[in-house]
Amino acid sequence: MKKTISISLFIIIACTLAGTASEDVAKEKQYVSVNVPNADIKIQYKYSLLEDRVIELNRTGLNKIFSFSRIYKNFSWKYTDFPSGRLDGLTTVQTFDTDIIGPIMVSAESNEDGDDPIAEFTGGWHGFNGNQSGSPTARHVSLQVWVDGKMVNDTFKGYTNDLVIETTSNIQGFNTKKKDGSGREIIQQKVKMKFNEGRADVHIKMVPLEKVRIHTYYGLQTALSQLYANSSIRYESGDSQEWKDTSSGPNDSGPKGKYPNVYRMTAKNKHNDEVVVWLDTKYGLGKRLNVSDKYPSAFFVGYKSYFNLINGIPLIISTGQSAEVHG
């Protein structure tokens, strides 16, 4: 059986299986555990006849920003097309110890007062040292959750049709960050995720807190490690419809000047599990107006795949404006 994990800028979809269920429960094909005070959310969905998958989100990394943290599997004892509703006996199949909700390379246009103004990413998992070390460069601000249209202020466990998560964080610029972590926050990141039957539509809105220059930005990223190590990858509307082997090193979709509308990346492991990543290329940063023609529209390097959204043509925005992406 072919199993699919699909990511719209990070979307996860389970295959639909035949089965019997009560009329009420059959309409609710995901089971969720929400703990707002502890910023911990688990979303269970049907993956195969005998297996459920669970997406976990919590505050991760050096900056403790709310994001994807793990994917688990557990045995499903219900021969139906909805998950078991059991969250015990989980086995980790993927740990996200890297950026999924991506960092940003951004600088303040005035009042540069940072301790190390070298162009580097901030936010995500990136600390003052430019990697996963040093003082934090971002701060978690808020988390709000709705289950079937009703806000959850405390905890919730049960089957749902729709789960909406909104999280906000503030990010320092590379020319305003400080060794002691007190750097000036210059841009706010708002992320809205809508989950339905294991699928998440993601909208990211970057709101400047002052006039800023965004040098490089990829939006959401995928980690092709562990479960998806040594996958093959294909770029829709890229230079080739052939599968490219990630174990052979970096690859890409071809230059944006020739292939500007790459809207989907599909990675497949040897067991035919797939990760499908798509981008709305008619909306906001997805139009790639701030990507130089020489850079690829999408690419794979190391163990991660990316869409190029800002690269080579900096975007300058001021308060009252925003930069947005949807997938």
What do these predicted ranges mean?
Residues T222-A223, N230-G302:
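Active-site/ligand-binding surface loops and adjacent short beta/alpha elements
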Residues E23-S133:
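Beta-strand-rich N-terminal accessory domains
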Residues V25-N63, S69-I71, T266-G327:
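Beta-strand-rich recognition/accessory modules
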Residues D162-E166, R199-D201, G320-H326:
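Intrinsic-disorder/low-complexity, polar/charged segments enriched in Ser/Thr/Lys/Arg/Asp/Glu/Gln
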Residues M1-T4:
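Positively charged n-region of N-terminal signal peptides that target proteins for export
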Residues S107-N196, K211-R213:
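Extended, loop-rich substrate-binding clefts of extracytoplasmic carbohydrate-active enzymes
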Residues I187, G198-S240:
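Acidic (Asp/Glu-rich), glycine- and aromatic
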Residues S8-T16:
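Bacterial N-terminal signal peptides
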